């Protein structure tokens, strides 16, 4: 008799094989492999196109009055970015998170905020070499074919079948219920931001590129709090030490920095992880730097040797 854990492992393993097409006849298995191959290629192309659009956009500002509202540290960073591209005396802003988000949050120049926002939201939708519309259509078509090969009416039900939700109907019921609470709250917040805009007497209507800027102003007005004031408490070193302290409190592990360990980039740090009894758990590589040639995201990978 299998133990409960063994039975669960067997069920999950069996389902994984079924979802990979093990029950399909040979010709359909071959087609499924081809679909998976195409989806992989299309997914990589899609991501690369977005990355290219991120890197291609450059907003140069040549007049200091157009920097109104931007913190000094951000101006200095933008000037250094422009200098690195040979544009001395200008300020460079890009679509990367570290540039785009502070710009939308602090820039008093509404036309430039709009330009920045629209450039970001329209990545892959500019009818150029990086356009993703055809790729999206191909992905949707292939996903549907894959789902139907495996006995599902749509791709979302194929994906959700392996989750707690089980199907798209359950997900939509949950989202619609959540929407009934979230929408009135969002409308109230928008009205509050619009009221703040109206005080300026410009007769402008709240748009997506205004949201961060007026939220920051509202925070200052209501709570006398500026995000800049709390930044020093969230330096990388402080956040990392805080995370390590939480790991120690929750799991009893300690992380000690190691020197002289081979790394794939000079910015990477290496830590030895030990359990509460002092036994070694593993080695933890921390890469905290954002790179322009990589998609902005956070991930943790494990390697067992």
Which positions does each model-derived feature cover?
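Active-site-proximal, well-structured secondary-structure segments within enzyme catalytic domains
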Residues: 9-10, 41, 48, 53-94, ...
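Hydrophobic alpha-helical segments, chiefly the membrane-spanning helices
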Residues: 303-305
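Noncatalytic, helix-rich "gating/capping" subdomain that lines the substrate-entry/channel surface
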Residues: 3-158, 242
């Amino acid at each position: 008799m299998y133990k409960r854990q063994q039975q669960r492992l067997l069920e999950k393993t069996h389902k994984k094989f079924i979802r990979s097409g093990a029950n399909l006849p040979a010709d359909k298995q071959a087609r499924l492999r081809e679909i998976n191959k195409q989806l992989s290629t299309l997914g990589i192309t899609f991501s690369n196109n977005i990355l290219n659009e991120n890197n291609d956009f450059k907003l140069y500002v040549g007049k200091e009055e157009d920097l109104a509202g931007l913190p000094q540290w951000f101006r200095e960073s933008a000037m250094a970015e422009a200098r690195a591209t040979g544009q001395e005396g200008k300020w460079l802003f890009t679509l990367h998170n570290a540039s785009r988000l502070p710009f939308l949050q602090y820039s008093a120049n509404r036309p430039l905020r709009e330009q920045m926002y629209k450039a970001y939201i329209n990545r892959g939708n500019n009818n150029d070499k990086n356009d993703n519309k055809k790729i999206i259509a191909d992905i949707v078509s292939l996903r549907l074919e894959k789902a139907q090969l495996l006995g599902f009416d749509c791709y979302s039900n194929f994906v959700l079948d392996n989750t707690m939700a089980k199907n798209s109907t359950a997900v939509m019921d949950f989202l619609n219920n959540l929407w009934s609470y979230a929408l009135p709250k969002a409308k109230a917040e928008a009205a509050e931001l619009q009221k703040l805009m109206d005080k300026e007497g410009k007769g402008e209507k709240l748009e997506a590129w205004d949201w961060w800027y007026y939220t920051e102003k509202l925070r200052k007005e209501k709570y006398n709090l500026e995000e800049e004031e709390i930044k020093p408490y969230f330096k990388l070193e402080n956040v990392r030490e805080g995370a390590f302290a939480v790991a120690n409190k929750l799991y009893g592990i300690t992380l000690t920095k190691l020197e002289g360990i081979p790394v794939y980039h000079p910015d990477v740090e290496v830590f030895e992880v030990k359990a509460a009894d002092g036994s070694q758990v593993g080695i933890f590589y921390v890469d905290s730097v954002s790179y322009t040639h990589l998609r902005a995201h956070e991930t943790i990978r494990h390697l067992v040797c």
